Amino acid sequence: MYIHIGFIKNQLRLRKHLPTMQQDVGSILKHHRKEMGLTLEEGAEGICSVSYLSKVENNLIHPSDKYIALFEEKFKVDLKEKPSRLEEDIIDFIINKHFYDEPIQVDLKFMSGLDYKSKLNQLMYLTITNQVERAKKQYMELMPYIKNLNTKELKLFLYSMALLLTKEGRLKDAFSVLNLDMPYKMDCYLGCLMMKMRIMLATKMNNHPFILLNYEQVVAYLIDHEYYHIAHELKYDYIVYLVQFITLENLEYMLDKSLHLKDEQKKYVLARYHFLNGSYEEAYPIIQGLELYDINFYNLSIQILNKIGDKEALKKLISSQKYKDNIQMNLMSSYLNEKYFSRRLTTTSFIKNQIMKINDLPDMIDQLHFWYEESLENFKAHGFYKDATQMGHLIYRKIRDLSLTEY
């Protein structure tokens, strides 16, 4: 299932009026109407006008008692008001746990209602707990209810979608979705999480203007409000970003001063430095045994192993399929599997079809460099100079586009 960013933007444009009611009657009515396959006209037939039902479903008005009785009869549903405090408490609980990076344990039966708030809670929970396919199905169920969301709920929806897109490897789309919530505000936990994610994505895409304009003031804000754990995460992302621009001496000095970094994080930073500087034999021993620590370690590990030609270790990593939900990691793993093991396709055929034609180029700068080097090496070896030039132009434009992302 593909998540279309344009569809989300169009739904937000249709959101002309903010909901004035917080009851769940409207979204429950909409759920049952769609379950029965009825249009607005068919749902309102014999009860009220189409515009009246539309306003009820979008939480702009509350139906009078005489209409509620008719709706209950037509849709075979109980529309008596139920307290919605539980759903709001669950939202706050999930956000607070996620903000402090604590395990989230919630029984899904508490989020099994037919109203939009329950659907939103399920989307956030499934996304945070890495249930990507179920989260994508929940997204499709929630989309018709965008008009029902208040400002806080819309922020939660956009953040959930950005998380989901990031897990798929669609970093630029995730960044664009976060920027649908303008202007930037960090006046709550959710606002801080959204800004943290923007900067994290910017560091992976080499979006230099956004980093220069926002990083220092965001970290200062987080420290002033004693959100030290978030500030430390951003500092780690920033050091990983800086690795490509500084000397080893300066890097080691920064790591010595960064007492908040975990040992694993320091190892990743050093390994990435050596990899970017072509010292592949020095890079791999640093992260050996940590290849599956997280997706960044995995991405770096398979690229290093590809460079040093360690087929046994590479095959073990590829066969783990730990990050199968990430489109770009899947492509890289499939390519390396074809290159070294299955050999059903030539490397040039794979790059031409899967990278240049069928799939989007990656948004992570390291993965763009990977495809640039692999395509030039293979195309030139086979005399496909036109394809090599075309791929170079595509990647150059992609890198430029990522560094100039609107914000």
Language-model regions: role of each:
Residues 31, 41-42, 70:
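Alpha-helical residues within helix-turn-helix
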Residues 2-35:
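A short, Lys/Arg-rich alpha-helix, primarily the initiator
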Residues 64-81:
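DNA major-groove recognition helix of helix-turn-helix/homeodomain DNA-binding modules
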Residues 36-55:
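Short alpha-helical DNA-recognition segment
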Residues 89-112, 121-134:
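Alpha-helical segment of the N-proximal tetratricopeptide repeat
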Residues 76-92:
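Short C-terminal boundary/hinge segments that cap the last helix of small helical domains
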Residues 116-401:
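Extended amphipathic alpha-helical coiled-coil/heptad-repeat regions
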